[in-house]
Every structure is written in structure tokens, then in C-alpha cells.
């Protein structure tokens, strides 16, 4: 045996090849090779093979052409003897066609601890061959990189190392190879050659695609559906399915350690066997004990810059560990008798909160492993009930970029780990179960229009998943079929797995754009969500606020199919304008009665989610405390003095203005949405930026302001509940049942911008 030097030669390879005796450079590897030894007898050919052990370098999450699993080819058998039936465990068959029309069938059988590979060739009509021509197979195996296949130099190779076929019938040739099962998984790659005494170089035969034949050993081709990770039909294997239309190569990277960044095994998926349409797939036995997985994609099959490219996360992974998919699935959860409150839309009273900010402050008096988590929200359910809340609207909880914040997700199927001390998944389920038991629904803000700049879908198939906007930013291609499917599957998953009651779609106007960014009158995604049977009982809310912009949302005519409610931006504008003394009575009257100018299109007033402040922009107390020139878009008024003050008159005016804003909000027909912290006067010192928001300070509830405003909100929600016939309506009031008054009990001057008084009388019973 002779040792090869890793520095020898000029070309890297990760193939064990039959018949090659030249030296080649293998990066970070050592291996031995021996001269082929051939012994003939009784239709059996025994050949000693090479052994490779690959040592992984420290490449972080970079693609490396390596495998630390040993591959040792023990023996090769060429025999016409049939296999015993009781030895057969699993059989996979592959059928190929050559360019000349011959059929090549390959059967991979698991026999106890070995793999038997039988190759059958039929319909062979060699051109220019004589009667002494024979068919041989030159083959090799590889794992991590199919482009490392060594060139088969038949002229310089020892002919004894070539494996001949034997006749199994008049029209069929056959050979059999056998490998030790512990050396799997790997690919067997081979070419056929017709040789004769007159033509020692032989006639090479490839597939009809002009490529080598290739079959997986120790794993199977798998199935293209469902996308993502799923269990095989017998529960003993993992099926991997991954969409990438423009990738020429996709490598499945498997990890056997949850702490390392280096793959234990890489399988370069074959585009003929492991690809159906635009989906790459493979099935791997669970017994190997892998714990994580990812993919490496290359759009240029000839690129040599493998190590510079990152390993990407499966978009459908439901459990994430260190930016890789986990092969440990979610543990079962006892939902008990959990049932959604299924509150009618018109009866909702919504509280918007940030999971971390709600209980992160030390004043929450929660243990450190509970504060700032889903469990923390569940612990504060009594505060929500005191406000009359029957639905919480959670700011995005998907795994997101910690640098950019929750409105820039990098994944759509898992809650962020920072919201659960041990298991964010179980922590969230416990929260939902607890809130449901108290009659509180759970609504999620979701972002499906853009992603974080890294760690998301980038590197998988950018031209399919993204499009460039006019601002040169990358936006998620929502209405492209595969992206639409991803979003639908995500929504269904949150409903079925986490019992979520509804969704508020941030930057909803971008859901209306086509694959090139053009405006669509009938966007496929919005329509599909509207009529999806699994989402039929969920509440759907469109919010046109753009996290990139941070300004007040633009008004967009949203296609709704009588299913979609909307965060009513026009309501916010008109109420703020009236309270600060700039609006007209007609606008306020329209908002109080349910915004008929927006929702008389087959929906109703209950589809209007009414807010006067939100998590971006000025908080409620800042709306009456700051109004500098830079805050012109906020439509605020400082009540006579900018910022903090000790002047009693200014403070009394501010308190009155806050009560005015809340009073209008809670007597308006539609759904009131209160923002976290507004009940106790949380301030950002006049900053409208989302990142300026402070955690909820629970001590402020005991202050004079906090106690008064909390009691006022509680009173207003009880009024709404008692007179649901007036304030919680699914249909608009008829004009004849509403009587309006000015301050002198005359008909109001609707367009008088100086008027500051408006009264109304409602006949609750329809006439």
C-alpha cells in the first residue's frame, strides 16, 4: 500500500473511482490506495478498493467538499445468481435511457447489512460493434461534490479494473455490485462502454441527457411533496424536499452534532434522480442520528468558489437551531379542552402588545426566565381582562433579525427563541391556551412582504423569491406561485399547530404587487387566503403600514372578498385632526359611525379596526405633549408647551385631550385597538421611531394618571358591552336612526373647521 500526499497533483476530488491510479490533491484529507487485484472464477470478480477518510476543516457555516464519514468499498460481485427473497429488505429502482435508445435499469436492494446494486441493460443496439464486443461499466462513488468526478481515462487504465456485464437473457445484460451497509450513504456514478479487440478505446454510452448514470445508495430519491422536512411512510426515514428553480446543484448538509458548524455528511443531490420539476428531494434513514440540516445551492455548476457560499436554512423548517433546521420535531402538547373563543368580529376589543416589552421591565415582578416571554404575557392576563380586552394583537413573533427588529423576519414557521426560556414553541402554546381559557383571542402581526437582509430566503433562488422595487430594495415575491404556497402553508401551520385566531398583515399594500412589482387588481395570494378552508374561521386584517417608511400608513383600496378587515388609517387621521382643532365635523361623524365611505362595499363597520396611536409614531401621551415641525405628519398638539411640564393648566388640558381621544375611539362603531402602554402614559420623549419604544413600566399603573386612564378605559369597554346594539354592530345604522346636534341643538355646520362640538342620538332599534 502506498500513501498519497495531500499536496500532490493539481485537481481536487471527492470521488472514489475505479481504475484511476494517478495522484490527485484532496484538501484537508489523507487516504490510502492499493493496486487492483483481480481473481476470476465461477462468475465472480473480487477487486480491492480504495479507502478515504475526510477530515473537516473549520469553515463556519460555509460549504465544504467533505465528509467525515468513512467510505470503504469491500467487494464487488458479478453474478447471475438471484437474491434470496428473505434477504430483501428495501428495494429502489431507477430507469435510464441512453442516447442510442438502450434501457438501463438499476435496482438497489438492502440485504441485511449490505447493499446489492444490480444493473440491467436491454434493447442494446451498438453501432459498428462486432460479435466479440463486450459491455463494461466503469464506475465510482461520491458524496459531497459530483463535480469532483475524476475523468475516466480508459486508454491509460488497466482493462482488468473494468467491470464486465454478463448475459442474463437473450436481450438483457446484467451485473451486480455489493457494498457494506455501514459505508453508506453515497452515490454510485457510472458510464457504459462497448469494447472489442478492434476498438480497445471503446464506444462510450451516456444517458439521453449526455450525463453519467447515477443512483443513490443508502438513501433514496425521496419525494417532492410535501416541501420541507417530513417523515417517510414507515416513520423510519426523513424526506427532504427543497424548492430551487435556478440552482444547478443543491447539496444536502447533515450534522450529527448540535454544537458544531461543520457538516458531518454532504450529499450532492443528483439533478436526474433527486429532482422533480423545480424541487430537489432525498430520503435519509433516521437511524444515522443526524440532528440538524441545511442546504448549499449553486446556480453555476462550474463555479470553483464553493467555500465562499453559505449554507441556507430550509424555508419550511418548523424547528430552528443555530440558523439550521432541526431534525428533532416539536414534542406533543396537551391542548386539553382548548377551544377558540371565536368572538364575533364586531365584539372584539383589541390590545396590541410586544411580547418582550410587555413584561421585560423589572417592575413586572416576574422571574427572569418568565419576564419578556410568552409565559410573561400569560401571567399578566388579569391586566388584559381589567381593560375589557378580548383579543391581543401580538407584534411579529416569527424568528427575526435582532439588528433590525421583529418587522424583519428571516423565517415563517417558528417563534423566535428569545420569547421562550426553554422552548418558545411550548411557551407560546401555553400562552394561547391560557388566553383562550380567559376568553381572549390571539391575533398575530405577520410580515410576508420582505425579509431580513441575511439568513432568510436569500441564496436559495433569489430570482424566484424576490423582486427589486423602485427603491432598489428586495421585496418578497408574494404572488409568485412557490412564495404564495410558502405563505399559505405558514398561515395554516400557525392555525393548526398554535391555535392562532387571526392575522394582521403588515405592509399589506405590497401583497397587491405582481412578480415584477406591478400593481394587481386581483392578487392571487390575497384571494387564496380569502378562500382557504383551513383559514376560514380566522380573522384577516390588512395593515398598510410599511416598516421601511415608519410614517403614517398610506391609504390603499384593498381587495377584500368580504373577508378582510383593515387597520383604519383614515380614522386615525380624522380623529387626531378633530381633537387638535384642525378637522371638520363631517369627517369625524363618518368615522364615529363606522367609516361607511370605506366599508359599505359588502363588509360593514366591524371591518374597521380603529386606532388613534400605534407602536410606530407617537404614543398616546406624546400626541398631546409634542408637536414640533419634525412631527408634522403625526398630527399632534402639545397643548401649549413642548415636552415635559409642571404647569397645571397644560397637564389638565393634556389629560382632557387623552380622554377625548379614547372616548371617541370607544364610542365609535368598529373595533377599538389600544396600544400597549397608552393606558399608563408610556412616553418616548417625542420620538416616533419604533426602536424608541420603552418596555411597559408596571409601576406607572399605580400613578394618578395610570389609575385614572385605566379605569376610564375599563368603563368605556363595559359601556360597549352593555350597549352592544349601538356600539358593536355588524351592519351600519340607517341615517334616519341617527340625529346630530350642534352645541345649540341645531343641525351641525358640517364643513365648519372652527366647530368643536358634536352630539348625536341613536335609535338602537331599526325603524
Regions found by a protein language model. Give the residues of each.
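Carbohydrate-binding surface patches
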Residues: 237-248, 743-767
